[in-house]
Amino acid sequence: MVGRGSFSSTSSASSINWIPKNTKTSIESVSNTISLSENGQNQDLETVTTKESNVGDSDTTENIKSPFNGQWPFSRRSSQSSSHPVFEETHWSKHSKRPGKLNVLTPTSPSNVNAEVQSISTKTQLSLLNLSPHKHKKPKDGLDLSALQKTLNGSRNFLRGRRDAGGIFGASIPQSLVTNQIINGFGAASLAFAKLGKVRSPLEGRFNLVPISADETWLIVESEVCSLYSGEALHYSLEDLNGILILHLQALIRDTKMNEFVGHLETLFRKATKCLSDSLSPVPEELFLNRIIETWLFFFSSVLPYVQGVFLPIKTKLFDEQEKTQLPYEVNEFCSTNREKLNVHRLALMTFRDYMVLPIANRIQICIGRAESAENALDNAGEVFARLFQILSLLASVRTNDSKEQEITNLATKVRCLLIAS
């Protein structure tokens, strides 16, 4: 039991009496005598002498030898105002358990405890910093699409109000989209693209999107698609173009002009295909069929996949079953009615047929007639006509139920008969 002036620890075998001394702050040494009394007799066992440095107004600590490996888990602090026993600021730590070693309790000084607490606090702060979603994000050339990817692949906030979703992306187009090189290289689309750089305004570390007209966004898409048909490289990635096309779709729906989108697509592919047809005009007759095959391979293997990638949001945003629930009823009706007209793959093939092959059908028939009249003509040009038949057959598979479909079918039949006759 702890008293005000003394501390005693009793047992059936021994009794330890400890009497505090009134000490001041500057004490060089303190001697404590521990007496052990047994059967009414006190015997002096040992005297433990401890020294303590003079540090300000710090109290004097007595270290008493005890059965606890020479350390007491608590000690007595004496002061001028109170003689109550005070627990020592010694923290007992348990070593980690390792095979072949015993778990030993060792005291830790207050200074070490403070250092450990500070170290743990620092590690906690660092761990919180490591939770940042941008820590492992690698820098990327061109557009930073963290907000765009969150919208396209994450929550379904497509075409919601700006107050609810902060625009189509959740956030707006990053500033990295707009560079002088891109603006200067766009020509007719430069003004529209420059306006994209002005629609961003900072708000709590994010960016809101100011509405852009459909004409401004479409100029950019049109310029890039025409560049593909001309054999030029894209000015920026497909992800950027997907984002701009989504802006265009949102502007059309906001202005209730979705019915104009089909006309935009038809005009675009007609204009782009004209770039290919112009390249066949100066070609001589003996190289004409070879140039047609080369142009087709370029279109089918290089242009068409990228064009489908540019217009991917048409499939993922207008015809996706989950995304359709976020669209207005009128938009869903329009898309279901014009599904074939919004099929970019079909539209590109049909435009290639109508504005690339059919205008030169007469020249193709002349080449076929020359091959039929010449002896052993297919020995040298057999592979060329075989490839031509593949091209015409694929274009004839585009069903439009009009005279153009019938004309390309007849042309494919003539080439097939030539191959069979040989």
Swiss-Prot record:
Record has Oxidoreductase as a keyword: no
Chain residue ranges for the region called Disordered: 48-101
Domain of life: Eukaryota
Coiled coil: none
Localization in the cell: Cytoplasm; Nucleus
Main location group: cytoplasm
Composition bias type Polar residues, residue spans: 48-69
Modified residues (Phosphoserine): 109, 132, 201
GO CC terms of this entry: cytosol; nucleus; TORC2 complex
One annotated GO molecular function: protein kinase regulator activity
Subunit structure: The target of rapamycin complex 2 (TORC2) is composed of at least bit61, pop3/wat1, sin1, ste20 and tor1.
Protein task: Component of TORC2, which regulates multiple cellular processes to control cell growth in response to environmental signals. TORC2 is required for cell survival under various stress conditions. TORC2 positively controls G1 cell-cycle arrest, sexual development and amino acid uptake. Positively regulates amino acid uptake through the control of expression of amino acid permeases.
Protein name as it appears in the record: Target of rapamycin complex 2 subunit bit61
